Amino acid sequence: MIKFLNRAFGGIVILTILILITYLGRIPLALGVAAFSYIALHEMDKALKKIDLQLPMKCLYLTNGLIMIAAFINNSDIYIASIVVSVLFLFMYIILTRHYTLYDAFAAAFVMLYVSFLISHILRIKNVSYVWMLYITAWGSDTFAYLVGSLFGKHKMDWMAHISPNKTLEGSIGGIIGATILNIVYCREFGLDNNIREIIVFTIIAAIMSQIGDLIASYIK
């Protein structure tokens, strides 16, 4: 129970910070998201070094900034162009420097996709209510998955035991259901006109992506 409370409290602290920067406006949100993306890149670099993979961090830092700026501008053509330019620049950098292996190149491409591409989409969401729902989903899915899994988890996911041995089917489903309930309550309490089906579909997709992201992070670590 203490472990659960610590985990929930840590999630609430992060959620509070995200709510604050989102409430302050788009520029503080962009700065906060950009800062988070650079921290994530740094953590990915540390994790991958443990398995002898070297990332071209200067290149990834530069392309991350380009993608974040393009996402902030929120023009689809500019955003797509930033992705194409970033990928081309990444592989040209790797080829010309000759300091990296093929495995390093694929790892760098994955990190660009997993960190820069995915995180930048927060800045591309035009309806701020979906940003709030994204935060609620991430926290709610993690918290309820842990709680339900700890209390009722009986069916271990054997196929991912080498990544996360404590994951259970009940926990995964509980995380999705818990996040969905929280988002429905949020939309109803704040008078948002999102229909139930839209809320459920959005939350299920976001919760599944959140859980996959958690598994990827666990695998790398």
What label would you give each PLM region?
Residues 141-150, 210-221:
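Short helical (or helix-break) motifs at transmembrane helix termini and adjacent helical loops
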